Amino acid sequence: MAEFIRAQIFGTTFEITSRYTDLQPVGMGAFGLVCSAKDQLTGQPVAIKKIMKPFSTPVLSKRTYRELKLLKHLKHENVISLSDIFISPLEDIYFVTELLGTDLHRLLTSRPLEKQFIQYFLYQILRGLKYVHSAGVIHRDLKPSNILVNENCDLKICDFGLARIQDPQMTGYVSTRYYRAPEIMLTWQKYDVEVDIWSAGCIFAEMLEGKPLFPGKDHVNQFSIITELLGSPPEDVIHTICSENTLRFVQSLPKRERIPLSQKFKNADPAAVDLLERMLVFDPKKRISAAQALAHEYLAPYHDPSDEPVAAEKFDWSFNDADLPVDTWKIMMYSEILDYHNVDQNDTPL
């Protein structure tokens, strides 16, 4: 039985195994507190995320189970990886991942990025997305604060808690507004991996400009700002809108012409502007894919087709439509944790 140590962080009890020391708070999210720590086993710094009360409701239980399954399945250099997981005596769940020193949001607010850093960061984002999308996973909440970076400029995408299967009947507002694809705002029901390409395009533009491209005050203002630059959405895109209210709103907007991005980004590399034009397209089906973007001339210094892997198998989303009680989710979660630790579940009492 592992020995647990208790610590108070921001008034929250952290119960961690004695393997981890030097707890320091690094961030607070909607679903948990994140601390940095030192792993005594490896000597490496790690991030420990406490999922608060994961078994309090079926919705929270399912969300935690989904995040755990995704962290276990996704294995790629540009995606955050799980190094340990445990349940404390108080029945909180702790995910342990590698610790990277900063994130893109902090970098962007501290200083302008030079061209080679912009290229290298965008390359790694798209390399990670190519893999994630090949696994049948959509991130849905890609933004600078979800993109971690270390001192070697290695980049990893994190926070897959909102990620969901590529299927119709998608739920509405999930990603931070500035980076949200128009089809999430307009269609509500059906969207696919292209939403991540839009978000990556917004992040790319922010790296080029040093400020958010579409800083909407609310979703109405957000959509209006997008049309000021990209023009009115094409009629075939408007016809995909499911909500009557949304349709009326879009049709009420003044007709606008697209402004060439070369006018907006006057000092940018023309190849960068060309790639951005292909990422920020209203019609998701005409948006460039991650694999296609990697082969674009702007990323030629880093592009290596032999080292841009796809997933070995699709992620199994069969659990995602299940409407199960907390106790069932708990048993499934325990089973996943035992599997992660390579424990024979027939021999081990929970």
Swiss-Prot record:
Main location: cytoplasm
GO biological process per UniProt: stress-activated MAPK cascade
Active site residues per record: D141 (proton acceptor)
GO MF terms, alphabetically ordered: ATP binding; MAP kinase activity; protein serine kinase activity
Keywords: ATP-binding, Cytoplasm, Kinase, Magnesium, Nucleotide-binding, Nucleus, Serine/threonine-protein kinase, Transferase, Virulence
Protein kinase domain boundaries: 20-299
EC number: 2.7.11.24
Its biological purpose: Proline-directed serine/threonine-protein kinase involved in a signal transduction pathway that is activated by changes in the osmolarity of the extracellular environment. Controls osmotic regulation of transcription of target genes. Involved in environmental stress response. Via the downstream MSN2 transcription factor, may play roles in the regulation of growth, conidiation, trap development, fatty acid metabolism and secondary metabolites biosynthesis.
UniProt domain comment: The TXY motif contains the threonine and tyrosine residues whose phosphorylation activates the MAP kinases.
Record-given protein name: Mitogen-activated protein kinase HOG1
Source lineage: Eukaryota, Fungi, Dikarya, Ascomycota, Pezizomycotina
